[in-house]
Amino acid sequence: MASTKPGQRKLQILQALASMLEQPKGEKITTAALAARLSVSEAALYRHFASKAQMYEGLIEFIESSVFGVINQITEKEDGGMEQAYAMLNMLLGFAANNPGMTRVLIGDVLVNEDERLQHRMNAFYDKIELAFKGALRLAVTQGHGQEADVAARASLLVNYVTGRWHRYAKSGFKINPLEATSLQLSLLLAA
């Protein structure tokens, strides 16, 4: 890491952490193990991040910018509320399938013994996802799908479905793809 630029070093640390999170056994990751993976000292890690919590915050920032960036694209591209909700569901499940290590962050698995603010941040992430679903479902109501009175409950149901699929994926050691057999399930969830 000696010949890389500081911004690249931070990225290398986060990539190594994400890679370590992809291990199916889900063991606790220590800064010593992360430093060994990168062939640097723990002090070298702490030159870029004040704590392991800051490293996890870096991963959460990546998750937030990726997910909400795509949600914004979906709402701009799709005119139909049901289509928006369906696309968001598929994107959220696909994000986990493409980023198994990040799935452990999404479900809070690796945040259990870390700084409490990290779990609060993930809870806020879930709230924003639910808000995005509410927006899509409200649009769908104006287009003749469903009832306004059901929007909040349906949005909550969709978030619970997604987080359940993420949990199952992570707890299966990343063997049960979150996108597996979802077509019929999503049709049932989104039926008016």
Task: List each language-model region with its residue ranges.
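Basic, helix-initiating cap at the start of DNA-binding domains
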Residues: 1-37, 54, 66
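Hydrophobic/aromatic residues within well-ordered alpha-helical segments
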Residues: 9, 52, 59, 63-67, ...
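Amphipathic alpha-helical segments enriched in hydrophobic/aromatic and basic residues
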Residues: 21-24, 30-31, 42, 52, ...
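Short hydrophobic/aromatic patch on the recognition helix
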Residues: 39-49
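Hydrophobic alpha-helical connector segments
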Residues: 58, 72-98, 151-158
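Amphipathic alpha-helical packing segments from all-alpha helical-bundle domains
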Residues: 65-68, 72, 116-142, 152-156
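Amphipathic alpha-helical segments used for helix-helix packing
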Residues: 96-117
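Hydrophobic/aromatic-rich alpha-helical bundle segments in the mid-to-C-terminal region
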Residues: 103, 107, 119, 123, ...
